UniProtKB/Swiss-Prot annotation:
Coiled coil: none annotated. This is YcgL domain-containing protein CJA_2437. Pfam families: YcgL. PROSITE patterns: YCGL. It comes from the Bacteria. Residues 3-87 form the YcgL domain. InterPro entries: YcgL-like_sf, YcgL_dom. It comes from Cellvibrio japonicus (strain Ueda107).
Amino acid sequence: MKIIAEIYRSPKEEGMYLYVKKEEGLGRVPEELLTLFGKPQQAMVLLLTPEKKLANADIGKVIESLNDKGYYLQLPPRDLVDAEAKRIRTLNSKLSGH
């Protein structure tokens, strides 16, 4: 099975991406998700096949989600989230004088 997918990046969250089938666009993505995601910024178009490797997502789960729900949400890698949380904690402790 081959799927041409459009991948959008979130302007609100670094490392968060939304995959949709190119022929369907964003039509099946719930409004609530789009609100949380922010205005989608097109990042790339990819041909997805079961043999393809993705850097931060399981291709099988991506294809299954695209077929079932019409979209796949890729969350930021855990280390990126942890690094950002640590940076915010450090900044907050400096601001509060601790």
